C-alpha cells in the first residue's frame, strides 16, 4: 500500500488481505462484501463480513463454487445476482444465509458462450434493471453485432432484454451518474497496433442503442487497420476521454 498515492484527506488500508483472485465486488444492504472472480481455476464467489466494525473483514464465506467465470456481482432488494459467462444467477436473501447459501435461481441463461472477454461486469441502475457488459469474442474481428460487443440491460427477472450500447470491445467496469443516471463505462482498446493507440476509453451512455465504433473505429477517430471502412467513425460515439 505504501506505493499508492491518495488525495489529501484520504487514507487507504486493507479491508481484506487474503482474497482469491478478486475481480469485481458489491456491498449488500447489511454490509457484506460480495466478490466475483474471473480465474478459470478459482470459479468461486465469496462474501466478506466486518464483524466488529473496525473496517477490516474478519470472516470469509464461500457463496458458490465451480461456476464459469463468475465475474459480475450485483445486489438488489436483499438478493445477490452473479453473472457468469452464459448466465445470470440469483441468491435470495443472501445476507441472512451466508453460512448456508441457497441454490441459485437461474434468471437468464442466454448470454453468448465465448471465453474471450467472457467475464461479465454487471450493476443495477436506479431503474432496477440489470446492466451487463458482453465483450467482443476476439482481440479484433467482425462478429454478430446483436450478440457480442454490447452493453445489455434486462429486468431483475431476466425479461425485456435491451441493447443499450454496441461496438464495445471489452468493458471492465461501469457506474451510474448519481444525478443524470447516465451509464459511464470503460472500454479496453484493441491490441497489436502501437504502444499508445488505439486508446482505452471512458464512455457515456445517455440514450439506448448507441454505437461506440468497435471493430471499425477506435477512439472516435482511428479507422481500424485490419477492417478499414470508408466513414468508419461516422455515426459512432466518441469517448468522453481516451487513455493512452
Model region roles, listed by residue range:
Residues 1-20, 58-60, 243:
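A short helix->beta-strand "capping" segment at the edge of beta-propeller domains
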Residues 48-54, 91-99, 205-212:
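Short loop/turn segments immediately following beta-strands, especially the blade-tip
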Residues 39-44, 83-84, 99-100, 139-149, ...:
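Short, solvent-exposed loop/turn segments at conserved positions within beta-propeller repeat blades
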Residues 43-47, 79, 87-89, 150-152, ...:
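A short loop-to-beta-strand structural motif that recurs across blades of beta-propeller domains
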Residues 1-8, 119, 136-139, 149, ...:
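Beta-propeller domain segments
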Residues 58-60, 65, 69-70, 74-76, ...:
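Asp-box/WD-like beta-propeller blade repeats and closely related beta-sheet repeat scaffolds
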Residues 34-36, 82-83, 130-134, 185-187:
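Residue position within the beta-strands of beta-propeller blades
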Residues 18-30, 65-79, 83, 112-130, ...:
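Beta-rich, blade/repeat-based domains predominating
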